[in-house]
Amino acid sequence: YGNEQGTGAGIKQGLQQAGLKREDIFVTTKLYNGDQGNADKVTNAFNGQLQALGLDYIDLYLMHWPVDAHFIESYHAMEQLYKAGKIRAIGVSNFDNDRMEKLLEAAEIVPAVNQMEFNPTNQERDILTFDQSHGIQLAAWSPLGGGRSLKNPVIEKLADKYHKTAAQIILRWEWQRDLIMVVKSVHEDRIISNSQIFDFELSDEDVQTINQLDEGKRGLWYSDFQWHDPNAKIANAIDHWDDTDPSKPL
């Protein structure tokens, strides 16, 4: 997301101030869609990211989206980085079951993680079940679901019942469903509040109540991008992927 250099500087400063070591923290970054391709291309991109972060290794390296023409060879390149000790775990993002099946058929190493949009109104049940059956951990991006989930009357009622915020109710529900939650905020008070979910537990009945809120409404999916239309002239053309780093030559 163009923030690796700043993140690296923050990590260095934070470790020094807190008296911590590199192994005390867990760092995840992603392979740009525009950097997918053969081993040389992926490796060069990864080395650039490592340099920007100022680190010797990455704890988890994720493929951002499955570029249909390249995700298999890109994953093989990631496997080689894993074997070389540059990555401690490899994973993917936004893989539906069809693409995950294709990847598993070709992969030597099962992805540790599949990062998906997941929240009370978009629960990706089929993908969650498939991933869990293959030992793949689902990590939730957009875990709070925006206003559609946070302002849901059911969530608000549970927040009153447990004397917690709506966000804390949602995050606790996801924690009890064995998910990793990728929560973002620039507000210190919200960051602290979002972490305070371990002093209470939702009842099984309340977990099931939130389970019933699923509407299957994704905020972002393949159909939202022109490059996933097989009839489009730029289908799978990596120089048109939205996250292609503009500072790099195509």
Name every feature range the model reports, one short phrase each.
Residues 8-22, 47-56, 80-82, 104-107, ...:
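Acidic (Asp/Glu)-rich catalytic clusters
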Residues 65-250:
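Beta/alpha (TIM)-barrel catalytic core signal, keyed to glycine-rich beta->alpha loops juxtaposed to Asp/Glu
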Residues 53-69:
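Active-site groove signature of glycoside hydrolases
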Residues 33-37, 68-71:
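Acidic pyrophosphate-coordinating catalytic loop
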Residues 37-53, 100, 122-123:
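Short, acidic/polar
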Residues 21-35, 59-64, 94, 118:
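A short, structured active-site edge motif that brings together acidic residues
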Residues 7, 42, 46, 71-74, ...:
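Aromatic/hydrophobic pocket-lining residues that form the small-molecule binding cavity
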Residues 1-25, 239, 244-250:
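N-terminal binding-site loop/beta-alpha segment at the start of enzyme catalytic domains
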